[in-house]
């Protein structure tokens, strides 16, 4: 192929041939042609000398695609190799790019036709600026401003460059540049902003050219968030922006600028200017958009520009109110404009656009939190510091003053807050528990996939409704009951109206005092049950059923206190279990489980007016209740009844209830086992296998809820289960041995293996949930050593169940050192054979990988002495497998491997084998961890990489190591100590891995690691900066490097939510639910 000539870069590249190759890649040619072109272009990009041909290519091609290809090559060099280039090459490229931009933007015609190319050149120039400025290109900003004044089109493009520069430094810099470089660029932009400011004012005052004014407003928008406020409030800038606001061509860009100004907050120095700005803005807005206009309707029929205006308006109001609403509150003359602004925002909140609603919702959430916070601290001054993180001391004399101020504030906001309650009730998002939805064709169906965006929105709306309920319980109750009565009367009957209302009712669970909640719920449940009776049609009844189930599932406190309601609700759920409309039975079973888990004690005592506990009555009619349920629904039901039985404190009654619950499955089990004793072939029939599987799954769910009390039931079937396990295992093995790998995918083998897995899962579930009683371990573990472990070792790889590994991990985690003597047997049975399965590549046997390393971690944590007793060959295998684990790109496996490694490092440090272990493995571990830390595929493991390296760097100074880490036979000169050796070794290791970094930079980093070894925060920051400096992590999504900080913030938020009644739903709070 002629294009192969392009690989030869010893002479100027054939641009015509390059054009043809690039076009072949982008064209609709054959797949082979595109693949061939792709290979050549990739090789050219990878070749370190291609960039030297960029100028030649740009000067000789007319193809936009080829120009972009050349600029991509250049961009890579600028990002990763720029500082290694000779000064003359850097200056030459910098001047060439600048000249091309000026040439193309000087002429109106070329500027418009080549706009895409100019935009890409601008990006390249800004990448160069980030490297060169300010140290090596001090005159960049003055040069740009001078060029801007030579022609209006050049000025327009200069504005685009200035916008790009601000975005690169202030918006996209985190994770791409070191903290020091970001700081340097920000200081330079700040110090030279006066020139930019003067240029913008000059253009906005003097130019009549629409494109230039729009480009200037757009650039200004990028700068307003960080420039000193004096440039805004002590110059004509704000006045000019407000002058442009009524002009339709500039309205949206001006509004974006005003939103940026509104989002700034530097104390109260400019408060009066903010009030003046808001006042002028509101007067202008009411002329453009009358307050009585139906904004949602106007939005739905408006142009894209008009819709963008409403979106920007939402951003302006929310930004302004978040920071400056208190200024408007403080002066009576501003109150009417403040209420008008809130009125606009409530009207905008009804717009049928998810993004607009998210913006509004975020503000409403913060406003009601703030109103609730001030009210809460007025009523409970002693509690507030701990609730809201305020360090204040409240004197009795100040509390009354605060209370009266809060009362006035509540009066001011009472009307907007009442309207906001109406908004929230009418737009509540669907909670996760609701399984019944309306599809795009208007049919009521079972939900097939969760929408995470909707769940996040529900969480925020629920929190907002909780605060609104706390601010005025009566108004909340009144609005909800009024809307419910309109559902009953038919005045507002509609699926969506009932759904959002019931979701809102369910969401405020826990926010009312007990007496009010009781009164409220009695009316709600009665009305919903009445609605179910009067409304006809299967779809209608399904919608009402789902709402009844959702509401009752949220109010366990009410149900615990009202037995008759609880019994009525449960009987209603039993009724729904016979309703075959998609989703109703699933939701009925899920709701029953949720209620039982929170009210279980109520079902095992004899209630007033009853002759026996409810659980006994239920067990008598068990077959009828579950008669129409599918197997998976029956399993959920059985788990629920198991929860009830677990609450019974009398062992004799508990045993009797369990016997009655398991009577049907036990009867079927005994029948199958009895037949199998006559002829084992019965166990090979697919229908029998399915029945066995179903029985085992039922047992597993009951074991989940009963824990230790399941002992009598599992003892009854345990040995028979092991026999079934052995028989099915032999069938699977012989099928795979005779039929090859394909046999493992046949329906019969899949079914047999499902039974094996369920047996293992049942045993694991019971042992995990049972209390730590040694006699249980002694009863169940020995029979499994051959039947399960031996079977695993003997089987062909494709027939080995990964659940064996997790079962024995659970056993070791549960019984700890008691299992130490068994570890060699476990090791012998699973280690070597599993390792052979998972180390051929990173893909095969994914389940075995994770569970194998979880088992190793359990052994390392609780039976470490057993690891020490391994031979050096076996220990090497363990260490190799650990390294193999954290090299894995599957996050769970890599994290399990790193946690296991940390566990072993700490344990070996405390052991007698410390010196021997670290002499053998210290350098290998350090090398391997640095390899995964710096390769960008393992970023989620960043926190653990840091902890491993911190351990290693701390270890060399700790005194734990009495022997040298270097090999005296191969190292020509001895080191004074291990610290000196490790620092030098690490510097050499990283210098060879990152040739683009100087030895000084690497040495500085390594010394920084050593100096910060006792401060994990500084240690982590050093590594983050190094990763960015090394260029390996530039232009990547680096949020994983900050994951630990994000997790800590989430925990602080959870603690705050726990302190406010209702914010975490009662159904989500873990408690013992003794129901006394």
UniProtKB/Swiss-Prot annotation:
Tissue pattern of expression reads: Present in mature pollen grains, unpollinated pistils, and 2-week-old seedlings.
Q: Which UniProt keywords apply?
A: Developmental protein, Membrane, mRNA transport, Nuclear pore complex, Nucleus, Protein transport, Repeat, Translocation, Transport
Q: Name one GO molecular function term.
A: small GTPase binding
Q: Which Gene3D superfamilies match?
A: Leucine-rich Repeat Variant
Q: How does it sit in the membrane?
A: Peripheral membrane protein
- Record's keyword annotation contains Protein transport: yes
Q: Where in the cell is it found?
A: Nucleus, Nuclear pore complex; Nucleus membrane
Q: Which GO terms describe its cellular component?
A: nuclear membrane; nuclear pore; plasmodesma
What biological-process GO terms show up in the record? embryo sac development; mRNA transport; pollen development; pollen germination; pollen tube growth; protein export from nucleus
Importin N-terminal domain segment(s): 37-103
Output the InterPro entries linked to this UniProt entry.
ARM-like, ARM-type_fold, CRM1_repeat, Exp1_repeat_2, Exportin-1/Importin-b-like, Importin-beta_N, XPO1/5, XPO1_C_dom
Its main localization is nucleus
Give the matching PANTHER family. EXPORTIN 1/5, PROTEIN EXPORTIN 1B
Q: What does this protein do?
A: Receptor for the leucine-rich nuclear export signal (NES). Binds cooperatively to the NES on its target protein and to the small GTPase Ran in its active GTP-bound form. Required for the maternal-to-embryonic transition and during gametophyte development.
What protein am I looking at?
Protein EXPORTIN 1B
Protein source organism:
Arabidopsis thaliana
Gene, per the UniProt record = XPO1B
